[in-house]
Amino acid sequence: MAKPVQIEVWNPNGKYRVVSTKPMPGTRWINLLIEQDCRVEICTEKKTILSVEDILALIGDKCDGVIGQLTEDWGEVLFSALSRAGGKAFSNMAVGYNNVDVNAANKYGVAVGNTPGVLTETTAELAASLSLAAARRIVEADEFMRAGRYDGWLPNLFVGNLLKGQTVGVIGAGRIGSAYARMMVEGFKMNLIYFDLYQSTRLEKFVTAYGEFLKANGEAPVTWRRASSMDEVLREADVISLHPVLDKTTFHLVNKESLKAMKKDAILINCSRGPVIDEAALVDHLRDNPMFRVGLDVFEDEPYMKPGLADMKNAIIVPHIASASKWTREGMATLAALNVLGKIKGYPVWSDPNRVEPFLDENVSPPAASPSIVNAKALGNA
Ligand SMILES: NC(=O)C1=CN([C@@H]2O[C@H](COP(=O)(O)OP(=O)(O)OC[C@H]3O[C@@H](n4cnc5c(N)ncnc54)[C@H](O)[C@@H]3O)[C@@H](O)[C@H]2O)C=CC1
Ligand SMILES: O=C(O)C(=O)CO
């Protein structure tokens, strides 16, 4: 028997029962659901990560849809329970959905939503922040000041790397990888090398045009190159940022061998998913190469870190906050709620998950569609 969990209820007489496994930022998402006759139940349990049993208890006997989090294990057990309870839709409040077994969802006819686009710039900005913080040793310097160790300017104090004219490498030049590349190229006049399974024509055009602009103004132009292998990026780039999806092809993409291929004083940033890096190998590499620096937002066994990582002065570590701006988090909540609502109401799936702006304008009603359903094709409603 699943144990009861604490909830907060909005619009108790609503016809459709929608459960959110966590309180989410803003109220627009709640209002949009209530306006369409949903009873909204929000889990207010104090524990951060809900177990499958907790979520089973939330789903109960009748549930039309669930908004869940990337920390939860959405597989066979939960999708079968949701389907038994009459549920049509689940949405992650995240763009990444490696915590979701989409095949299991397909088996039970449950739509799986995610929240692309609204977090692109916010996530890229955190990757850029970590790049700068690592290049200029900001966290080490901050700790030094707070410890009362500053006793005057010195020529060698916290000397770091100049980004201008160096090469930024992007692995996974999708929405976020491309946004990050543009920030680093335009903001710091870095040259770009990228690796992705697909060509990023828009990104290439952007760098070409910016290079021409610089040249016309008498400055050295920036350049771009699409690498034919990830190794090329690792060997050549001074700053490397990881932005692929997490799947079988990207698990431990950065491992002992690939770390060795990188420059001794390179900077590695990860705002994608922890398991893209073999974290134990990274700790060894950081220990053996004090000039090598890393900025991590995500960890292999979140919320834990591999032994030794927290002691590394050449690592900057933050707790999975890359999408944590107010506008973005409220927007993610809205998109997740509208994914679920759209399926409940029988709306079509939005035609382009890369263009979700119409759902985010608070001054107008959102389109009658689910913004992003990743298994729409498999369920026959693309
Ligand atoms: N740290 C955080 O808070 C956040 C993390 N993320 C992570 O970032 C990921 C990317 O998000 P978006 O840019 O919106 O997705 P996207 O789908 O636009 O981009 C992913 C890119 O990775 C590429 N890719 C896939 N396999 C690859 C491989 N083996 N080698 C090289 N490239 C490969 C794809 O072709 C695609 O261009 C998400 O799946 C999520 O896991 C996203 C938002 C916030
Ligand atoms: O959206 C995602 O995939 C995250 O990791 C959180 O924003």
Curated annotation (Swiss-Prot):
| Enzyme Commission designation | 1.1.1.29
What is the protein name stated in its UniProt record? Glycerate dehydrogenase
Show the CDD domains listed in the entry: GDH
Which chain positions lie within coiled-coil regions?
Answer: none
Q: Which residues bind NAD(+)?
A: 175-176, 271-273, 297, 320-323
Q: Which residues does the entry assign to the active site, renumbered to this chain?
A: 273, 302, 320
Organism source for this protein? Answer: Cucumis sativus
- Record keyword Transmembrane helix present: no
Induction data: The appearance of HPR in the cotyledons of cucumber seedlings is both developmentally and light-regulated possibly at the level of transcription.
